């Protein structure tokens, strides 16, 4: 990499660290290209991104950002996963780590909060933003559905009573 490419990478990473809501740092030593490609595809499918950058360049990009404390984790072959959804990157990383022993989560950050391995795993157990929105819509719609059922129930009961009387009259 020449100097211009390094500056461009640092600028890109700086923008990422300032705009992202969650960052996960992990060791990937020993993973095959196919496994790393699968991780990238899974991250992309969930709305997250994986970057492998030189630790020194990543540390420069982290300076002055909310997640600057993550720089202490950048030792050895590390990758950085990030997403705007606070649950997407941790969830994919934890699921991937369960199936690949060589993928080791070191920690991360959410906003200005530093996360250890347990913190990243705890984030992974939370429902995603889309799941929370769906639950909220369901909770909002539930009272309206109940009201509709309550208002139509007497009419339905009355119709069944009339139907029973009609059958009784036909039988007689």
From Swiss-Prot:
UniProt KW keywords: Ribonucleoprotein, Ribosomal protein, RNA-binding, rRNA-binding
InterPro entries assigned to the protein according to its UniProt record, in alphabetical order: Ribosomal_uL10, Ribosomal_uL10-like_sf, Ribosomal_uL10_bac, Ribosomal_uL10_bac_type, Ribosomal_uL10_CS_bac
Recorded GO CC terms: large ribosomal subunit
CDD domains: Ribosomal_L10 (cd05797)
Family recorded in the similarity comment: Belongs to the universal ribosomal protein uL10 family.
Record PANTHER family: 39S RIBOSOMAL PROTEIN L10, MITOCHONDRIAL
Name of the molecule in the record: Large ribosomal subunit protein uL10
Organism of derivation: Xanthobacter autotrophicus (strain ATCC BAA-1158 / Py2)
């Amino acid at each position: 990499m020449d100097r211009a490419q390094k500056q461009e990478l640092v600028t890109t990473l700086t923008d990422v660290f300032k705009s992202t809501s969650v960052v996960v740092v992990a060791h990937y030593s020993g993973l095959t290209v196919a496994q790393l490609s699968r991780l990238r595809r899974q991250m992309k499918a969930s709305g997250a991104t994986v970057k492998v950058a030189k630790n020194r360049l990543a540390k420069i990009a982290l300076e002055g950002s909310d997640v600057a404390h993550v720089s202490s984790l950048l030792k050895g072959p590390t990758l950085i996963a990030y997403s705007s959804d606070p649950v997407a990157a941790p969830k994919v990383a934890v699921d991937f780590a369960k199936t690949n022993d060589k993928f080791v989560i070191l920690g991360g950050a959410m906003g200005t909060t530093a996360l250890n391995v347990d913190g990243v795993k705890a984030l992974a157990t939370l429902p995603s933003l889309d799941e929370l929105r769906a639950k909220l819509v369901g909770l909002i719609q539930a009272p309206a559905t109940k009201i509709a059922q309550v208002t139509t129930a007497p009419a339905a009961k009355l119709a069944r009573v009339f139907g029973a009387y009609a059958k009784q009259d036909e039988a007689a």
